[in-house]
Amino acid sequence: MIVLSIVCIGIIVGYYYYLTYRDKKDIENSTELTKVGEVLAKDLEKDYPPTPREVIKFYDKILKCYYNEEYEQEELEEMADQARLLMDEELLKKNPKDQYMLMLEADIKNYKDNERKLVDTTVCDSKEVEYKKVDGRECAYVVSRYFVREGNTYSNTSQKYVLRKDEDGNWKILGFKMVEGESSDD
């Protein structure tokens, strides 16, 4: 009987130790981030996307978070700051942060009010990126395609982004032109 009691106490103590240790280990190893968390965790000052295509891929990731994910107002502002770090000084001057935030919030509200979802984004292949010199500065043209669902209607939209290399050698978004695609009912 004493041996059985000692074994039971040992099992209880061992189980308690296991639960205590496991919880701490899980918290320490819990590096899974939400999509919003991934966007906010990227340090663009240390790890700026190296190519025009990668800049647009990260920008598209931000767009998907804007339109598809749940987040707090503070996180929206931080995501907007990340997006603005990808923009050329000329574009930033034309869109001061307060104005940018007002337009962004209105656009997101419209998107959600119409129950739209940004289903997928696709950036053109590297070989499809066009490089040109404009006014003595290196520019790149990158096309990104957006697949959007609104109810039972799907639409494809393409945007052609113009990026310009800054004095640090980083590609920054100077502007874009949207081209509407066809819609289909399913």
Please tell me what each predicted stretch does:
Residues 2-3, 81-86, 158:
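Short, charged low-complexity linear motifs
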Residues 12-18, 39-40, 93-100, 115-120, ...:
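Short low-complexity stretches enriched in small and charged residues
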Residues 104-150:
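Surface-exposed, charged secondary-structure patches
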